[in-house]
C-alpha cells in the first residue's frame, strides 16, 4: 500500500504544477523550465506550492525533487508564422 500512496501523491503534485490558471491579460505565464535529469530516486521536496517560494521563483519538479526555481517564458501561445509556399 505504501508505494501506491506515494505514486498517487506524486501524480497529484506533478499534475498540479502542470495546470496553469488564467492570469491577468498581458501577464507573462510562469512555467517550469525543462528538466532533462533522469532520477534513480526522488529528493525530499523543498516546496509544495509557489507560495513557498520567493517572489521571482515558482515550485517545480527540478533535478529529482520539488524545488524553487526561476520560471521561463511560456511560448506555447505565440503563433509561428507559416512559410509561404
Curated annotation (Swiss-Prot):
Q: Where in the cell is it found?
A: Secreted
User: Under the GO molecular function aspect, what terms does this record hold?
Assistant: serine-type endopeptidase inhibitor activity
InterPro entries in the cross-refs: Elafin-like_sf (IPR036645), WAP_dom (IPR008197)
**Cysteine pairs bridged by disulfides in the record:** 32-60, 39-64, 47-59, 53-68
State which tissues express it: Constitutively expressed in tongue.
Q: What does this protein do?
A: Antibacterial protein which inhibits the growth of E.coli and S.aureus. Putative acid-stable proteinase inhibitor.
Protein's recorded name: WAP four-disulfide core domain protein 12
Protein source organism: Mus musculus (Mouse)
Gene it is expressed from:
Wfdc12
